[in-house]
């Protein structure tokens, strides 16, 4: 830490930036440490970089050798961890093999191509679903089953993420008593019905973001994935309300992490309550773009 200050200099800022800077430094320090969690995030990143090149019509042998070597090294390290059979690890291995084919037989190489697929969902149906999504704070006394929670979690990683890192980790409880206790950690958790069906913490593993310039990417990545969940929730008759985590204090942060067993390397981006609405809130008018 002191080396970073000497090497990069320092500035004086208002005291209200203290918590923000402390959080950023904490996550930056964690991201610099080696771990399997960091390796798999970076593995997806480097596999994504190779994948982009392997889709190009003008792809040529000889490019991105450093990326290839880093990816190969990461896959080898992960082969002795719990991530060895992870679907994305197997996917990354296929990119590695395709890259090797390009180097060995460039003249006969055929770039990657996906299947031609036409969506069966019309623009009108999609817009209708988007407009149907509504934030609600009053819920029926009806439990949200584990099966539905699993189905909602399955859609989160189908959103885009920076360099395909897929950093999102979800921490959820469908115990109404427990959910209500979690809600008390959020300053925006007011005006809710007494029955709180589920509580969700949307987090990003910080270990895949190793540069200061990437500081805000976890918030972008999590938000993109979360939108998938809220749209999918509407298809089950569920509605969710997002709760900002920007105003949390030290005690609230510690308490929520304890309640949901959220590790230190997961950045809590925001939280949410999801359940069956007791009644629908009116739709606010939207401005034109």
Tell me the role of every PLM-derived stretch.
Residues 1-289:
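Acidic, surface-exposed loops and disordered segments
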